Amino acid sequence: AEVVADDMHYCVRTYVANSDRIVCHPSYQAYSYSCFLRNYSQSLTDEDISLIPCAYLHNYQPEYRQTLSNPIYKEWTGLAPFFIKNEVGAFSDFVKKYITKKSSKGDLLYLIDHGRLRPTKALQDSLASMVKGNKEFMLLDEQAVCFDMCLKTMSQCLKDKKKRTIIIQGGPGTGKSVLAVNLLMEYINQSLNASYVTKNSAPREAFLRLLTKSDAKKLVNIKQLFRSPFNLSKCDINGYDCLIVDEAHRLVKKMYGDWNGENQVKECINASLLSIFLLDEDQAVTTKDIGSIDEIRHWCETLGSRLVIKDETKLISQFRCNGSDAYIQFVDEILQRHEESIAVDLSELNFDFRVFDNPNEMRDALRVKNLENHKTRMVAGYCYDWNVKHRRGDWDVMLEDNFKAKWNLENDKVWAINPDSFEEIGCIHTAQGLEFDYVGVFIGKDLTYNPVTRSIETHREAISNDDNSSGIRSAAPAKAHQLILNTYKTLLTRGQKGCYVYCEDHALRRYISLSIKVLSRNL
C-alpha cells in the first residue's frame, strides 16, 4: 500500500482486483461501518449494544505496516485500530477486552442483521444541523412549492402503501440538487429510510463536503445517506421509503461490477415506496444514459407505481448564471439547439462571458479569479487523450500557444471542492451537477462553425480514442450530434458569475464573439 495525501486523509493506494487503485484505509472502513450501524440499527438502540470497530488484515505483510500507521491516518487508527498478519495475539487480546461473556439471549448478531433499519435521532439531528441555516440549501420560489408537494405525496404513500414516482424537471441552475438535499433531510427527520442517489460520485462528494464543511467525523457519520444506484438490484421491493435520484438523466442500465443489475431506473423504482427523479433530458451526455421521462414512465407502468408529473414538479427559475434565463437561451442559440431562432436580450445580462483567442490568457484570467477567492475551474469536452493516465506523456490537453494541462483523473471525486485542483481540467463526469463562481470551457475540434452554411457542425471522429464512456465515436450521426451539444451546454452553464471560452476552431470563436456583441438579435 502507498499513502495518498488527500485532504481527508482516509485513502491508500494499493494493488487490488488486478489494478492499481485508491481505496479507503481499513480503519476508516471499519469505523464507517460502525457509524452506519449506530445510525440505522434500531436493535442497537433498543438493546443498548456497544460497537467497537477494528480491522484485521490477515494477509498484510509486516514490512508494509508503517504505510497504514502513517500519522496522517491517526484519526482513524485511533477510532478503529488495525491488526496485520503477525499480530493475531494482539487482535485476540483486543477482542477479549470488549467481549467478556455471551449475550443474554445468544442472538446478538441475529438482532443486528435482521433488525429494522431506521435513521436514529442522533442522525436526524446531525443532518438537520448541517442543512438548516446553511444558505447554500435555502429553498426559494417553486422549489418550496415542489418540496411541499413531495412531502404530501410521501404521506399518501405511507398511508395507502401504494408506490408512487415523482419526476422533477429543471434546466441548469434551477435548484434541483438543493431541493433533493432538503427532501433527504426532511424524510430522515421523519424517521424514514431515505437516500440521496446519483450515478456519478462527484455530486455526492461535493454535497458531503459542503454539508460537513469537510469535517472528517461529520462526513463519515452521514456518508451512508448518499449512495450510488450500484447494487440496488439486490434491494427488497420498497426496501427504502424514498430514493431521491438527482442527475437522473445519467442513470444507465448497469454499472461495471453490478452483475445483478438490469436497469437502474427500474431498480430505483422497485427499491422504494416513493421514488423521486430530478432530471434534465438536455444533460444526457453518453449513449448509455437512459434516464428519460419515457423510460421512467415505462417502468412505472411495469412496476405499478403511480407517476406524478405536473406543473408543480417543473423548476423554471434560474439561480445560476446570475439568475439569468437569457444566458441559458443564449447558450441554446449559439449551439443552434432549436430549429427556430429566437431573439435573446443580453442588454441587462450581469454575467461575465468572454471568448479568448489565446488559451494561456484564458487560464491566466481564471487563475486571477481563483486567487481572488472565487471558486473557479477549467473544463473540457471529450476531445483530449488521457496521456498521463496511460503513461504516454506528461500532458493531456495541448493547444496552440504552447498551452499544456492535465486531466483531473487522479482525484476526480474531490476535484470540484479541492482548492488545489484549479490547474487540472475537469471532464463532464466530474463537473456535471456542480457549480462554480467562474468556469473556463475549452471547446475542442468536435464542435465547429461553418461560415458558408452559417451552421454549427459536430464531429464525432474528433472524440478521443481514450474515451470509453460516452460512446459518441460509434454513435449514429444524429445521436452523436445531440450528445456533443448536450455536453457543451452542460459545461457552459456551470458558472454562477462568469464563463470564459476558448475554441480550437477559429470560425467558431469568431461566431461566438460576434454573437455576444449584439445585445438583442436572432443569431
Regions found by a protein language model. Give the residues of each.
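N-terminal pre-P-loop "Q-motif" helix
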Residues: 135-164
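Conserved lysine of the Walker
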Residues: 176
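Signature of the SF2 helicase/ATPase Hel1-core->accessory helical subdomain module
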Residues: 244-310, 314
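C-terminal accessory regions
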Residues: 276, 424-522
